[in-house]
Amino acid sequence: MVVLTICGGGNAAHTLAGIASNQPNMEVRVLTLYADEAERWIKSMETNDFTTIKYATGKDPVHLKTKPKLVTKNPEQGATGADIIVITVPAFAHAQYLTALKPHVKPGTVVVGFPGQPGFDFEIMKIWGDLAKQCTVMNFVSLPWACRIKEFGKSVEVLATKDMMFGSVRNGTVAPKMDPTAMIQGCLGPLPRLECSGHLLGMSIMAVNGMLHPSIMYNRWHDWDGKPVDAPPLFYHGLSQAGADLLSDVSNETIAIAKKVMEQRQGVDLSNVIHMHPYYIGAYPDDISDKSSLYTCINTNAGFKGLTHPCTKTADGKFVPDFTGRYFGEDIPFGLAVTRGIAEIAGCPTPNIDKIIEWAQKLMGKEYLVGGKFTGKDISATRAPQRYGFNTLDSIL
């Protein structure tokens, strides 16, 4: 029997709770600290089944009717005796959960970020201290599914499941109950297939969302004349060749960071930092109709169809870009800024990453880069290694 604790109460937590509860030899608990989510979920399950509806192209939907054993707001109830803890909340909430979990986590526990986002392991090391070294940490670059809650605490829809998902593992000094990759694969079932390789630092260098979303925002809006547009532009399927080239350049800079680290520390494997083009082909093998380039991969990915730039409506019915959402608020401080902080330590120039951060920080009213150096006053609100006092390669490896 594997005891799984899921942290969070959103789309991903609902989905994992339903899917994992359907797997054999699995005790599933949900710990949600947000507002009254636990109470609402418990109340719903008193009178309703919990249904996970899985969709797949060309097949009838599959309805899984299962319930987690426990839903709670109490960290002691949720975490005591857990073999594996999966954190599904956004990066800004990780510290709250890690702090609440710490007194109740046993050495040998597997801690998983779904996705952990860049700096996940830095946050764990800072908050858990020696306990972090005794636990196995896993970080994945994305969520396994496209999913949405249909009715809170009652049903969730899995609109698409990735074929493969990439991640990395750092083994702790105390062995887990079983192989950590096999353990989390057992929670998910056969798909997505989990591929874990390379050093955990690679997951912080290869900030997929941190590269993708700010690059697309920069390409579309950096020279905007301030005039409202008639409709929100398509986000992915409106990507220009120039935008794809910028994203490719940013991706190449992350590969250069990885190579620079490996040059200085023999034996550190950062081959898990790959270009965005092969990443997309691996992540969406059946959704992309033209895989010939990064530009075509994004523009012909069926999963991106119809998605638009975040915009707000003006009084006269037109639209202006909204720079207050997660594409900046999460993907810069918990994404691209982390990558840039690692580059600073490695001594690797990143002109394209710098260009995007310098543009974004003005719109955000933040300061990360000053005169080309990663020394701004708002680094303390990021997950860059410098925020935690990690300023050498040895401290982040």
From Swiss-Prot:
This enzyme catalyses: tauropine + NAD(+) + H2O = taurine + pyruvate + NADH + H(+)
- State its Enzyme Commission number(s): 1.5.1.23
UniProt keyword annotation of Transmembrane present = no
Q: Has keyword Transmembrane helix? A: no
One MF annotation (Gene Ontology) recorded for this entry: tauropine dehydrogenase activity
Which keywords belong to this entry?
NAD, Oxidoreductase
pH dependence statement: Optimum pH is 8.5 for the forward reaction, and 6.6-7.3 for the reverse reaction. The half-maximal rate is observed at 6.8 for the forward reaction, and at 5.5-7.9 for the reverse reaction.
* Superkingdom of this protein's organism: Eukaryota
How does its record describe regulation of its activity? Subject to substrate inhibition by pyruvate for the reverse reaction but not for the forward reaction of the tauropine dehydrogenase activity.
The entry's function note states: May play a role in maintaining a redox balance during environmental and functional hypoxia. A methyl group in the beta position may be critical for active site binding of the keto acid. In the reverse reaction requires NAD(H) for the activity but not NADP(H).
- Which family does the entry's similarity section mention? Belongs to the lysopine/nopaline/octopine/opine/vitopine dehydrogenases family.
- Output the PANTHER family linked to this UniProt entry: BLR6086 PROTEIN, OPINE DEHYDROGENASE DOMAIN-CONTAINING PROTEIN
The molecule here is called Tauropine dehydrogenase
The source organism is Arabella iricolor
